[in-house]
Amino acid sequence: MALPVVAIIGRPNVGKSTLVNRLCQSREAIVHDEPGVTRDRTYQDGFWRDRDFKVVDTGGLVFDDDSEFLPEIREQANLALEEAVVALVIVDGQEGITTADESIAEFLRSRSGKTLVVVNKCESPEQGLAMAAQFWKLGLGEPYPISAIHGVGTGDLLDQVVNLFPSKDLDEVSDSPVQLAIIGRPNVGKSSLLNSICGETRAIVSSIRGTTRDTIDTRITHQGKEWKLVDTAGIRRRRSVNYGPEFFGINRSFKAIERSDVCVLVIDALDGVTEQDQRLAGRIEQEGRACLIVINKWDAVEKDSHTMSAMEKDIRSKLYFLDWAQMIFTSAVTGQRVEGIFALATLAVDQSRRRVTTSVVNEVLTEALKWRSPPTTRGGKQGRLYYGTQVAINPPSFTLFVNEPKLFGETYRRYIERQIREGLGFEGTPIKLFWRGKQQRDVEKDMARQQKGVRN
């Protein structure tokens, strides 16, 4: 199952970015909440009480009718709330209830979903309860006083957030159709590919960029498996997109990536990999989606016996974000190899949903440690990798318990990821590793409990 998502909602200047940094123990969020500065949703990883989750910050939500970005901001907030398990509404305890807070509360009351009111800037625990009491008037339930900058009350808040998460179940796989999103720049042949797959004219096919301005869903059955195919609007640089219907189509395209089980990234064989293709590859990897790369218009390429291998090498060097993805060369016009898309997509989805027992994970880690020990600092302190366990699927996610995460640099982390992939497979899907610090005595207790459970 995918990691649960926590949405951060609120007006500007209430400390949302500071809270994100506090919850995720990072400094990645830009602490500058001028209205309109952050309109895109940004994601960071969080961890509390043995639960991994995603935190999405939508930026400052305003309802000023004069705001140029009002439709865009509302769209981003709606998308964040749709995917969130729980929404945290951030308000300013020192300033009190404002008209903007009331507008946001009214906006949220019209929606279903779990919501917690978080009263920030309550630096004193004693005064915090009194400052928070007035926010009962918003009608969103109990307010939680915190100080994002000092960490006061954030532990209690996280306890409540985690309690609202669905129970962990690695076997939970939806019976709904497999969602396959067809992603790519404008005019690379996405709609033609969809029509070729379905054997009918389902999407408008045109050489004019931007013909498909919305996502188009098509349900089909292939070899007994139900599929939901999504043809998305062509995605290009935001500065080249005029504000209007095309903008919202691109937003829904990004949403299609987030909600898909597998993405088909379509590359134009005549153009090769562009900067925008690389951005899309990065987005797919960032969202943790299974993926296959389709090189379309292969019929239009002049080629010899070496062309395919040379092009694959060139494409893989540029799409390094997706070095784990399978690749297939197709022609939507002639139907060449289009049927093979289903086989590769099925493999990618199955791998993204696969789970591995803790004992098998640790066999791979033990072997990796034999070949290459963790690095040692100049002061003589060495990293220790105690054990690992799979905590989620779609994408396969593993928590690795170590003495101090900061002792493991990016080079060694990439080495461990490669060893896990080589030892366990996972073709066509990214894998996520979460490095968590833990005391040796706690590790020994965990291992003892696991061994006892096996004996019982």
UniProtKB/Swiss-Prot annotation:
Family membership noted in the UniProt record: Belongs to the TRAFAC class TrmE-Era-EngA-EngB-Septin-like GTPase superfamily. EngA (Der) GTPase family.
Name assigned to this protein: GTPase Der
InterPro entries xrefs: AAA+_ATPase, G_ENGA, GTP-bd, GTPase_Der, KH_dom-like, KH_dom-like_a/b, P-loop_NTPase, Small_GTP-bd
Source species: Prochlorococcus marinus (strain NATL2A)
CDD domains the record matches: EngA1 (cd01894), EngA2 (cd01895)
Keyword RNA-binding annotated: no
Keywords of this entry: GTP-binding, Nucleotide-binding, Repeat, Ribosome biogenesis
Function per UniProt: GTPase that plays an essential role in the late steps of ribosome biogenesis.
PROSITE patterns: G_ENGA
Pfam families in the record: KH_dom-like, MMR_HSR1
UniProt-annotated binding residues for GTP 1: 10-17, 57-61, 120-123
GO biological process: ribosome biogenesis
SMART domains: AAA
SUPFAM superfamilies (UniProt xref): P-loop containing nucleoside triphosphate hydrolases (SSF52540)
GO molecular function: ATP hydrolysis activity; GTP binding; ribosome binding
Subunit field text: Associates with the 50S ribosomal subunit.
Every KH-like domain range: 354-439
Sequence ranges assigned to domain EngA-type G in this UniProt record: 4-169, 178-353
UniProt-annotated binding residues for GTP 2: 184-191, 231-235, 296-299
